[in-house]
């Protein structure tokens, strides 16, 4: 989710509930998934919605090959430059909530040259197809900022170490703390769903999107034209971390940069 959706921790659940339920959900919801059906690219709202919902179903059933190579952040690095795709502008310093991020160079490599930069970013990052921001005064941007490495973790139940070369699709890591376990359980519970709605700004129903959360440290690229659904390595920066904004770019400028 994510460059990414912004997530807030939910009310902590009792530990005796979290571990068995989380384990069951991971096994039920946990081979690199097959790409979505190939064919001529279409971008009508109904086609995009169908493509996106298929990606959620695919991401929810994990296989051993989900455990693929990830971008590792060496333990000796103190600060890391990250980016987030958002309609809410620059994040506050310190961060007011957990923020999903990726490495700007890896994201730019996949979106460069795409005719629709916003849609390309949404597909690469595993975000729902949203042609316009939720409020008229908002604008989609990519914010690049610097954070301490120690404030980052991989959203991976098999291990959250950002220096690891991959996540595992087997058992839960014994090193997960209560806060991270609750965060990951919330991701699974709120990601694997379709067909839900919520009241929009005009009082009418709007989609309450799920997400193709892989739980394996990489985003699900739901672009049907992509050779693989493996997107980019994704990370989460914890609430309260200091964040120094380096640049705010339009999606078009970010994806078109050399």
Can you say where each PLM-predicted feature lies in the sequence?
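Residue-level signal for mature regions of secreted extracellular proteins and peptides
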Residues: 23-24, 248
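ADP-ribose/NAD+-binding catalytic cleft of ART/PARP-like enzymes
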Residues: 34-102
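ADP-ribosyltransferase catalytic core
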Residues: 95, 105-163
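N-terminal secretory signal peptides that target proteins for export/translocation
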Residues: 1-14
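C-terminal motif of bacterial Sec signal peptides marking the signal peptidase cleavage site
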Residues: 26-29
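Structured loops at beta-to-helix junctions and adjacent beta-edge loops in soluble globular domains
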Residues: 3, 84-85, 146-148
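Active-site or metal-binding loop neighborhoods of secreted/extracellular toxin and effector enzymes
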Residues: 164-258
């Amino acid at each position: 989710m994510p460059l990414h959706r912004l997530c807030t921790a939910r009310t902590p659940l009792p530990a005796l509930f979290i571990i068995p339920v989380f384990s069951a959900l991971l096994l039920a919801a946990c081979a690199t998934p097959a790409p979505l059906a190939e064919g001529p690219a279409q971008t009508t709202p109904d086609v995009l919605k169908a493509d996106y919902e298929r990606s959620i179903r695919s991401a929810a059933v994990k296989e051993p090959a989900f455990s693929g190579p990830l971008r590792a952040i060496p333990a000796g690095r103190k600060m890391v430059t990250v980016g987030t795709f958002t309609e809410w502008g620059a994040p506050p310093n310190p961060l007011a909530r957990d923020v999903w991020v990726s490495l700007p160079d890896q994201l730019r490599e996949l979106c460069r040259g795409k005719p629709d930069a916003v849609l390309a970013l949404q597909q690469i990052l595993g975000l729902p197809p949203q042609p316009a921001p939720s409020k008229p005064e908002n604008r989609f941007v990519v914010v690049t900022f610097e954070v301490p490495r120690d404030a980052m973790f991989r959203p991976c139940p098999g291990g959250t170490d950002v220096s690891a070369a991959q996540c595992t699709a087997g058992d839960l890591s014994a090193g997960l703390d209560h806060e991270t376990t609750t965060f990951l359980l919330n991701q699974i519970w709120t990601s694997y769903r379709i067909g839900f709605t919520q009241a929009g700004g005009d009082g009418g129903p709007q989609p309450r999107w799920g997400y193709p959360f892989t739980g394996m440290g990489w985003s699900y690229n739901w672009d049907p034209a992509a050779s693989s659904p493996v997107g980019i390595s994704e990370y989460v920066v914890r609430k309260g971390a200091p964040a120094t904004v380096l640049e705010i770019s339009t999606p078009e400028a970010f994806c078109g940069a050399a």
